[in-house]
Each structure stands twice: as structure tokens, then as C-alpha cells.
Amino acid sequence: MFYKMIENKCKEWYNSENCTVRNLIEYIEKTGQMRDAQIEAIKVYLFLKIGCECKPLEFLFRYGCFNSINLNNIELSTATREYLEENPAATALFEYSRLTNDKGEQVSEKLEKQIKKDPSSIDYDAFFRTAFYGVSYTDYLFSLPMGAGKTYLMAAFIYLDLYFALNEPTNPAFAHNFIIFAPSGLKSSVVPSLKTIQNFNPAWIIPEPAATDIKRMISFEVLDQGKTANKSNKTKNPNVQKIANHQPLSELFGLVAVTNAEKVILDRIQEKSGQINMFEESDDEKDRQANELRNLIGKLPSLSIFIDEVHHAVSDEIKLRAVVTKWAQNHTVNSVIGFSGTPYLEKTEKFKVVDSLSVGTD
């Protein structure tokens, strides 16, 4: 339901004078190559990138960036009204509590009453931090209907980021390099994903000559090769070499790497009861190689990490979040963008608001 607030604000932004991409969206609609669900996702993506400066969702909700509610139309005590007017995070949660789902059911009448009665009883910042898993980096999830063309949407996002990054090279909202994690459970998913992205025609979403210029700048790498031993029996990781070939990494622009996270990025990581061990001090050659690749990817500047089918294995999810969190400490991660063809949560998650009240998010 958080999405409803984002969607409402996106529509408001798109129709306002602040929107700088209306002509671009009209161009995309005119070419007629993208599906409606893809165009809607592109609108939201550009709103988050440009209208919201690619900030983390937790930050955007806490600072009221998605607030659309008019408090003047609601019966409130003077004290509550003043509290909400001075606390955008409180207003955000208040607006969220009043949303209705497709069946017309309110998110939480109890929460609305609690805020009206005693708004200062809730730690709003803590609620939003918990609701978005406490991550410090930008992490957006796009859930599209099955068959709506997720991989083409990834390609569109890549080209759009590079298009704006070329115009504003120092704007931190736009990614310069990309790594795509193909679904873990599918052994043969990496190459088809790459081919689909390579076959994408950027002129469907970006006018010429920019479309062709950007296509020429992109270099693709598949990180799927096993270890190779040279004559000295010293094993090498060819995936490391593929990244290292793009030195100097600090100036790298337009790299699109595709890999299987489970086999490559999460190799040699142990997860037990939520605790992660990357064996960084290990003398084992395989541990060393796995960490060498992870460390190198962590140096790629303005990196956007695309995760296809984010909802698969829970253990892999924990490992992947640990790796991305470590990369984010280098201040090289622009964003993590998840793509799913099915709802991410099998059941509604509940987050505590006050001791006697929890709220579900979906």
C-alpha cells in the first residue's frame, strides 16, 4: 500500500511544472514499443530518480515526500493538527493508515485513531526504518505482471540512467554502471537475459542521435566462467579479469555485467541464523578469489544493482543484502533495483507501531 502514496505523488509531479520528462514520456508513448505496465513503471522510476533525487524510500517517507493528504479536510484536535503539520513522518503514517485497498478496506482504522488520540506516542522514524528493513542505500522494487517484459524494462532503466548521466555527469541520482543478477534458480538465465538487453532498441525510449551514441558506449560482460588453472597451477578467476579489463575503474561508464548471484557473487559465503561469514581472512584460495571478485565489483563507480526475481531463496536474500551493504559502505552504490513478476511477500508483514498495535504492509 505504500506504493499507492508513491503513485499518487508521481501523478501529481508528472502534471506539475517541476516535471522535466513529460516530452520524453510522450516520445516513448508515440514510439508504441513499450507496454502500458512498462511505461507506468518508467514514470515512477523517473519520478524517484528526478523528483526524489534517488533517495532511499525510508528517507522519502520520513520527510513527507509522498504526502498528498489535506489535513484541513479532516476532523482533528488542535494539538494533533499542529503535531502533524510539524512532523511530516507522522503525516505520512497518518495518510497511510487512511488508504483503502481494492476491496475498499482501510489499511488501519486503529492506527488512524491512535494518531488522532496521541500522535506523540509513536516513533515514526523508527517505524519507517523498520518497514524498509533498515537499509542505508536506495532500494526500489518493481513488481510487474508476468509477461509484462521485465528484462526490457531493465534495459530501459539502463538507457535512461545513462542518458541523464551523460547530461549531468556529477548528478549522484543517475547510475553509470550496472550489474544484473539473473534468477538464482535458473541455470540458463544469464545469457538469455543478456541477449534480451542487447537486442533492446534504445530509440524506443530515447530520441536519436542520443540512443545510438549511448548504445555504442555500453560494454557487456557475462560473469559466468568457472575458475581456470594456468601452467603454474595457480587458479585464476576469469570473472575478476573481465572487470579488471575496464581499468581505470574510477572513470568507468556504461558497463553492464550480467551474472548469477548464487553462483558468482554469493560464492563462499556462509549464512547461519542470519549471521554472515565471508571468510575474508581465510587462506583458502577459493575464498580469496570469491572475495577478490566481490571487492572489485564494490569499486565500480555509480553502480546500480538490478536483481531479477528478488523473492527466491531467503538464505540467498540475506547473503546478498550483506554483500550489497558492504559495497554501499564504499559509497559507490547508486541504487538497488529489484524486479519481480510475482508479489514479493507471500503474506503481509506486520510492523510494531506501539506496544499494543502493529500494522501490516503489502
What are these regions (language model features)?
Residues 115, 119, 131, 135, ...:
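P-loop NTPase motor catalytic core
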